[in-house]
């Protein structure tokens, strides 16, 4: 494109210390050069909105070109990129006012005038500050702005290299748009990478694809413009006008996934803060769900212009949710990448979080199978909220689903809720019992035997986060959570079925007491205590944490992360009714070496059952060999 020489163009200097401000903006305010295009498109969309508003009272301004549009023209050979709109345009004085002063935005002044005239009713305009336009100098060594105001007979050109001065003057209307503004970027060496159709189209679709004006691209001189954005944002439509397939297509585009959404949440919040949210729960688990740096993937828009996907619009325990939130009244500071009013953002975060959880509750009640699929994929993440979000803990507990000793662990078996669990409490049961660890192991843990024998249901908690949230003072309907691997089992008030009580004879109390005392003395400081167990029915031994200690699995997790000093000594529980223990107790003290070997082997057996190894494999092997030899006939 060429521009006519302006007759006696007037040279001016910017009213602010532009060189310093431009340097700060280019090198500090914007962390991503791509935003220049977003800013220019936003300005163009504002110009179209201004024209629409003024045409309400002056329809002749539209002429024969009533449909708004934004056109991007690429001149790779000439190293130029042009952004043109058919909006309201600018007069010479408006150019000087809007472009000659940093941080004096024509859009902001226009909004103030509109609000004053309309009693505070807001016009839907994007720009709030006057520096967005100047982001063009990140990629351009010179910028020409050619504009013809709607209804005017003259056109003007503004030119600057962004170094402190600019020129402004009249231009032949034949060299200007029929109406609106044309911004011509003479790209610098780094900026020439933007004279590329695919790069421009990608940026438009990522950041400006939902502005309320169609966007076209012209790749070559005299080529027909191609539409690359239709000016429609799906979330602005009424839900009744959107099909399930429309939602699914939008989900795939915004989430970058190929599955169907398991849950769609679309709502508009009105009141003190107005915003629209359209978010989705995926039906498949993202591969990076548990990456340490994984954050939310909800995109923040302001008036349909993409701002960031790093605004933490949802808590970390909802980081699997994808979608968009669009605010019409969220203020922005100098850069649209930095949010100015955290109080508004906090209100949006609270509202969207609450609505997502409420919709999950509704789905759980109306379609248990569909909700079970969501829980299977994301339950381990949702449970992080039980530890982190005290305010919503009760709601999250109602959303939680569990495999238990009653339900079984197979994938196709049902899930249990805490409401189900509490409804089935046994007589005299005062706690909600749980065990943490890998399902394949804990399902057969010896610590469960006494609970199973009494029909007491135990939650099976396989995820690492389970070891943390259960220690956070959580209760449900007044019932505390209690680990079956910590402290005393307290099962004496929950009787065994009559048949089980009759099957196992009581051992001699004195023999058992003497043997337990011997084992405790023999093991010394390897254990905190040795005691008779009321939680074991078929196994001989098990390990539990002391009452004042921490859960065994949590202790292992902290130790593996280097966040635990000296580990607490475990308690060894011995089943006095087990035939092996009864035989050892009745053996007497005549062969102390044999009984000492047996005591150590019982501890090592308990360690193995707990998923550990013998503390001294060499000593374990020697003791095992001696005990086996003792049972063989002498040659």
Swiss-Prot record:
CC annotations in GO: cytoplasm
The keyword Cytoplasm belongs to this UniProt entry's keyword annotation: yes
Key words of the record: ATP-binding, Chaperone, Cytoplasm, Nucleotide-binding, Stress response
Matching InterPro entries: HATPase_C_sf, Heat_shock_protein_90_CS, HSP90_C, Hsp90_fam, Hsp90_N, Ribosomal_Su5_D2-typ_SF
Plastid recorded as keyword: no
Region: C, residue numbers: 557-635
Pfam families to which the protein is assigned, alphabetical: HATPase_c_3 (PF13589), HSP90 (PF00183)
Location within or outside the cell: Cytoplasm
CDD domains noted in UniProt: HATPase_Hsp90-like (cd16927)
Entry function: Molecular chaperone. Has ATPase activity.
Family: Belongs to the heat shock protein 90 family.
Subunit structure: Homodimer.
Protein name per UniProt: Chaperone protein HtpG
Organism: Azorhizobium caulinodans (strain ATCC 43989 / DSM 5975 / JCM 20966 / LMG 6465 / NBRC 14845 / NCIMB 13405 / ORS 571)
Lineage summary: Bacteria, Pseudomonadati, Pseudomonadota, Alphaproteobacteria, Hyphomicrobiales
Protein encoded by which gene: htpG
């Amino acid at each position: 494109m060429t521009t006519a020489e302006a007759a006696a163009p007037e040279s001016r200097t910017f009213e602010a210390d532009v060189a310093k401000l431009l340097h700060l903006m280019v090198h500090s305010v914007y962390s991503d050069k791509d935003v220049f295009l977003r800013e220019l498109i936003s300005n163009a969309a504002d110009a179209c909105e201004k024209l629409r508003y003024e045409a309400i009272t002056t329809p002749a301004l539209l002429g024969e070109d009533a449909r708004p549009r934004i056109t991007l023209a690429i001149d790779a050979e000439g190293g130029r990129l042009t952004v043109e709109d058919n909006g309201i345009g600018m007069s010479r004085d408006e150019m000087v006012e809007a472009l000659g002063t940093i941080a004096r935005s024509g859009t902001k002044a226009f909004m103030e005038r509109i609000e004053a005239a309309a009693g505070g009713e807001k016009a839907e305009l994007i720009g709030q500050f006057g520096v967005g336009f100047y982001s063009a100098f990140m990629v351009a060594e010179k910028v020409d702005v050619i504009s013809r105001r709607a209804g005017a007979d003259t056109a003007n050109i503004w030119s600057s290299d962004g170094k402190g001065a600019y020129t402004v003057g009249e231009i032949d209307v034949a060299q200007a748009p029929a109406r609106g503004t044309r911004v011509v970027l003479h790209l610098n060496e780094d900026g020439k990478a933007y004279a590329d159709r695919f790069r421009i189209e990608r940026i438009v679709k990522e950041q400006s694809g939902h502005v309320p004006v169609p966007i076209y691209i012209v790749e070559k001189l005299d080529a027909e413009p191609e539409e690359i954005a239709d000016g429609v944002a799906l979330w602005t439509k009424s839900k009744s006008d959107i099909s399930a397939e429309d939602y699914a297509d939008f989900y795939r585009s915004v989430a970058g996934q190929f599955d169907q959404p398991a849950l769609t949440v679309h709502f508009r919040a009105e009141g003190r803060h107005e915003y629209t949210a359209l978010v989705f729960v995926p039906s498949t688990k993202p591969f990076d769900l548990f990456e340490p740096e994984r954050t939310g993937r909800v995109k923040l828009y302001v008036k349909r212009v993409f701002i960031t996907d790093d605004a933490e619009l949802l808590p970390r325990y909802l980081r699997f949710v994808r979608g968009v939130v669009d605010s019409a009244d969220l203020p922005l500071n100098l850069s649209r990448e930095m949010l100015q009013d955290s109080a508004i953002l906090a209100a949006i975060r609270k509202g969207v979080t609450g609505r997502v959880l409420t919709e999950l509750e509704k789905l759980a009640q109306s379609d248990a199978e569909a909700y079970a699929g969501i829980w299977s994929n994301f339950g381990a993440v949702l449970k992080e909220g039980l530890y982190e979000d005290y305010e919503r803990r009760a709601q999250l507990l109602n959303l939680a689903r569990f495999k238990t000793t009653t339900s079984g662990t197979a994938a196709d078996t049902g899930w249990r809720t805490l409401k189900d669990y509490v409804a089935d409490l046994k007589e005299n049961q005062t706690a909600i019992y749980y065990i943490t660890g890998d399902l394949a192991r804990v399902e057969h843990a010896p610590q469960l035997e006494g609970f199973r024998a009494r029909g007491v249901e135990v939650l099976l908690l396989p995820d690492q986060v389970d070891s943390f949230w259960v220690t956070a003072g959580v209760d449900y309907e007044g019932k505390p959570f209690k680990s079956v691997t910590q402290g005393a089992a307290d099962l004496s008030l929950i009787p065994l079925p009559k048949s089980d009580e009759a099957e196992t004879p009581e051992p001699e109390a004195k023999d058992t007491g003497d043997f337990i005392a011997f084992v405790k003395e023999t093991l010394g400081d390897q254990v905190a205590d040795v005691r008779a167990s009321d939680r074991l029915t078929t196994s001989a031994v098990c390990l539990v944490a002391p009452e004042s200690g921490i859960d065994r699995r949590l202790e292992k997790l902290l130790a593996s992360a280097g966040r635990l000093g000296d580990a607490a000594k475990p308690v060894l529980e011995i089943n006095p009714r087990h035939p092996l223990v009864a035989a050892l107790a009745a053996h007497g003290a005549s062969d102390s070496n044999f009984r000492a070997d047996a005591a150590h082997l019982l501890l090592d057996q308990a360690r193995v059952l707990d998923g550990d190894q013998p503390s001294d494999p060499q000593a374990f092997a020697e003791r095992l060999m001696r005990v086996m030899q003792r049972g063989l006939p002498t040659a």
